[in-house]
Amino acid sequence: MNYFEIMDEMFNEFEEYKDIQKGKGIRGKLITIINPNAQKLAAVVESIHLASLLHDDVIDEADMRRGVASINAKYGDHTAVMLGDIVYSRAFYELIDFGKEIAKIVSNAVYLLSQGELEDVKLSNSINLDKEKYMQMIYKKTASLIEAACSAAAVSAGFDKEKFALYGKNIGIAFQIIDDLLDITQDEKTLGKPSMHDYYEGKTTLPYIYLFEKLSENDKEKLMKLYRKKLEKNEKEWIRNKMDEFGIIKICYTEAKELIEKAKNAIKEYNIPALEIIADKVVDRKF
């Protein structure tokens, strides 16, 4: 069985589980490329990611997940939280079978992920222009579990876990930077949610941090007034035009691309073309 089939076997007794949008499964793909025999480990890590999304949608009051109704929108916050707890609990139960080293790697990532969720909530209370704080938050919230997935898979395959951890960390951070960009550059149909939704939710993502550095005082004030506001079409166009004027999208994309090159260089000696392809796809995607 592949890891998605293992997950279905783990959770299919719960009716609500069948309505979850599982997504790309990038963590599972990375694990099974590094070690094709680690399908169960991939299922455990993907389950942890899934549980974090269930909780994340409740925190963000998100009605949509990948273009369809979120579990909290369909069944309510209580059900979404409890389903997330069930998925987390079963994942940790299964994690014990992989031994102490892998269990510590993955459980520490969940600790970091949870910290990242909390930091994200705190940073969303007001405009954050501190790049270091933002980068630390996205490392914890997004990259830490990808880093752990690659590190744990390396342990299971007998590879250098530090090199694969570095690969995972860098593509994880790059993945989030690209997500930040897509929220601005893509439309609702492509994203499966409204465009520029991050700024409405209070998230001052990397493109906005860089834009604030470049704007005149008058334009800074205008951008601040749009914070947490449901943006009109002309307001979205103004933001996009300003991003274009200062080359913000290109700056962020270049930063993500540099992280991808670091990721590929970290594991170059292992010559695993599929991991290079995934790394490149992280930055060359539309959703």
Question: What label would you give each PLM region?
Answer:
Residues L30, A91, G116, Y208, ...:
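Residue-level signal for inorganic ion chemistry
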Residues M1-A73, D120-L129, K189-T190, I260, ...:
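Conserved N-terminal diphosphate/IPP-binding helix and adjacent helical/loop segment
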Residues D19, R65-S89, N128-T142, K189-K214, ...:
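Divalent-cation-assisted or electrostatically stabilized phosphate/pyrophosphate-binding catalytic cores
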Residues Y93-I105, S124-M137, A149-F164, I184-E188:
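Inter-helical turn/loop segments and adjacent helix faces that build the functional surface
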Residues Q39-D63, Y111-L112, A143, E147, ...:
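Active-site alpha-helical segments that house and flank conserved acidic catalytic motifs
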Residues T32-P36, S89-D97, S151, V155, ...:
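Short glycine/serine- and small hydrophobic-enriched flexible loop segments
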Residues F92-L113, K222-K229:
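Transmembrane helix-loop-helix
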